[in-house]
Amino acid sequence: MKRILITRPRAQAEAFAETLRLAGFEPVFFPVIEIQPIESNVALERAVSKLGCYDWVVFTSVNAVDIVFENYASAFLQEVPALKFAAIGPKTAEALQARGIAPDFVPDEYIAESILPGLGDLRGKWVLLPRAEIARKALPEAIFEAGGIPHEIAVYKTLPAQLDLEGLAALQSGVDVITLTSSSTVHNLVIVAKRNGLDPLSLPGDPLFVCIGPITEQAAREEGLVNLVTAKEYTTQGMIEVIRKMEVS
């Protein structure tokens, strides 16, 4: 049975792991990052109090949805004339729907830049972007170039996770596949490997790295990782399909 290393936060990995089990694989938890909400977020509080000033709210991750709605669900569920919601990726859209918000736009391609055409004419319009403290600038820059006014607000931090000894032991003994679901998982996996005497470019078992999308793949290549494949659909289900096909071949 092939062993699949899951590097995303444990709380977000359970459903992924269960799907892997049902597909006949052995999931191994090795979270290399954790998500920490930004506390006493004055900037977010101010933005929420003035939701009527915005034309769009764009959620780029489930993390952002969870954290924003944890404290401000009632404000977002109030009817705000002209305010529209966009979500990047089906899981982000599902997270919004679970909280009573039907996204007005979800792009077919699950990367930030792909959302721009669906936002329409942005000239003079305000776009609220609740996101990670460290995030790619492609989306706000594209909004600005289109004449819009992007308002980025950091709502969470991505931090290195506490070392999981069982996961480390699996990595040291060799796994078949390592799943990478964000640039942060790439960078922190490399750091953890080096700190524990492993060469990330030559890991035991010569594992296949499966990336969730092109941005993650780019981060992996920049770290020098090889033996990479990327899901055609930028979701964990898409990653599982890649793993299945590789097993057959």
Name each region found by the language model:
Residues M1-S249:
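Signature of uroporphyrinogen-III synthase
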